[in-house]
Amino acid sequence: QEDAKNSQNDIINFIKSSSNYKNLFPFWGTNCIYVEIYKGLIPELSKLKNVKKIDLEMGLIQEIESNSSKKNNIFFDENGVEPGIEAINVRPLWEMGYTGRGRLVFNYDTGVSSNHPAFSERFFANFYPMSQCWDGYFSPSPNGLNDHGTHTLGTMCGLVEETNDTIGIAFEAYWIANDFVTSTVEELPPVVDMITSFEWAFNPDGDLNTDFD
């Protein structure tokens, strides 16, 4: 955070010296600045020492088909492993002990059915406040309105212990999530909120002195 702050000082001071801007948001997670600024200032801004790139927010993302009206059928295969997992040859890593144990993953997607048996017991909110485990933009608590996020979280860390059906890569990892991905571009949260969600995931409890999260 300190490195980002130091490298952004001159840029922020330049922006603030002009009255032709609004909505200035500095970020440390990716060391960037979001600002709505008069286009005539962009050439001057680009000449500043610490400016590597200036990009225009286009708001483009691949649309995801909504599955909210479809029945979410769950099938378990005893001692099974998903073909995609076999395809990336992850077994040698598992045999070395790399199973996600003691790790925390972040699912940035459409939301999650937190009671899904493949990962419900490893939801971080079982142990810590919901504010540190769920960053909801559309819903204050985990939801499964669109099953895309539930599917991708399963790919990340799913495991049905009763049948030993291994769905995910890091099948012993704990997880946190958000619901920022939508089915249409028009429904997307502002880019500022999307970047902020990643910064939240870097430090969910807001305390730089803790590392469990």
Language-model region placement:
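Short phosphate-engaging motifs
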Residues: S7, L41, N115
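Charged, often glycine-rich, active-site loop that binds/positions anionic groups
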Residues: Y38-K39, V191, T196
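Autoinhibitory propeptides
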Residues: D10-E95
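Short, surface-exposed ligand-recognition loops at beta-strand->loop->(often short) alpha-helix junctions
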Residues: E2-N6
